[in-house]
Amino acid sequence: MEYVHKSVLLKETIEHLNINPEGIYVDGTLGGGGHSEEILKRLTTGKLIAIDRDEEAILAAKERLKDYKNVIYIKDNFKNIKEILRNLGIEKVDGILLDLGVSSYQLEEVERGFSYMKDAPLDMRMDKTSPFSAYDVVNRYSEKELERVIREYGEEKWASRIAKFIVEERKKGDIKTTSQLVEIIKKAIPASARRTGPHPAKRTFQAIRIEVNEELKDLDRALEDMVEVLRGKGRIAVITFHSLEDRIVKNTFKKLENPCTCPPGLPCTCGKQPVIKIITKKPILPSKEEVEENPRSRSAKLRVAEKL
């Protein structure tokens, strides 16, 4: 299948990266290669390090970007940025981009099991070599663990009922497909609550996907590592798709911009100096036109910071 992925907030992201044609840039979430391609168009002697956990994403992007010789492809998790750069003998970079969440390609590729709209095996792994999948979460987690995941990562108010219904249902046999899970969720959520708002399974599927791929785990640490490897005046641009991710990015940036731990109103004695300047005081949102053209962009937010 061709890797189709509309890059979200493309123009805004590239503009805010302030690309230096001779600089070194990192795309930590290569995906379909849309953002990478725009960065490469602006480089002369510079280079791009393109990272993704998904082997298929890398293969598809290599095809798309085959005319560019200044790309280094790395199959890894962007959280290992320091180790990745160390292995390449690179100390500092001029800009980093992260486009978090699942790509439209992964959603479209039915057998990956990311979508609640199509029947597929319960999988949801971004890295297909990982031994842990959605099947394990749904069939092996205790009711309490399921409730925690669905409440915490899905912000789902019916989490306890959904967890209870999953555990009841699996007594009859393993839950193996996305459509089985969707039916259980529909039964768990009262009909009156299902009439309005998004698809009833949306939040639970998001929660399980985040758990399977550990999407929020160590994200704050990874952001701090990325800021550390930025050169002065280098920028980091992060696109998020739900409030949990956005909160982590916002709070990490705030902490790095104002790390002082002294009581307000007293002179600073802790010696902690600001590391970044936040460029986007409020997140940049997609235009009305972009949302109409690409509904997936509706919940996207872009935050940008510059290394001091």
From Swiss-Prot:
Residues that coordinate or bind S-adenosyl-L-methionine: G33, G34, H35, D52, F78, D99, Q106
GO molecular function, a single term: rRNA (cytosine-N4-)-methyltransferase activity
Chief location category: cytoplasm
Subcellular location, record wording: Cytoplasm
Disulphide bridges, residue numbers: none
Domain of life: Bacteria
One GO term of the biological process aspect: rRNA base methylation
GO CC terms: cytoplasm
Start and end residues of each stretch annotated as Disordered: 288-308
InterPro entries: RsmH, SAM-dep_MeTrfase_MraW_recog, SAM-dependent_MTases_sf
Pfam families registered for this protein in UniProt: Methyltransf_5 (PF01795)
Enzyme class: transferase
Claim: Ribonucleoprotein is one of the keywords in the record: no
Positions of transmembrane segments: none
EC number(s) reported in the record: 2.1.1.199
SUPFAM superfamilies: Putative methyltransferase TM0872, insert domain (SSF81799), S-adenosyl-L-methionine-dependent methyltransferases (SSF53335)
UniProt entry keywords in alphabetical sequence: Cytoplasm, Methyltransferase, rRNA processing, S-adenosyl-L-methionine, Transferase
UniProt xrefs under HAMAP family: 16SrRNA_methyltr_H
Function: Specifically methylates the N4 position of cytidine in position 1402 (C1402) of 16S rRNA.
Family: Belongs to the methyltransferase superfamily. RsmH family.
This protein's name: Ribosomal RNA small subunit methyltransferase H
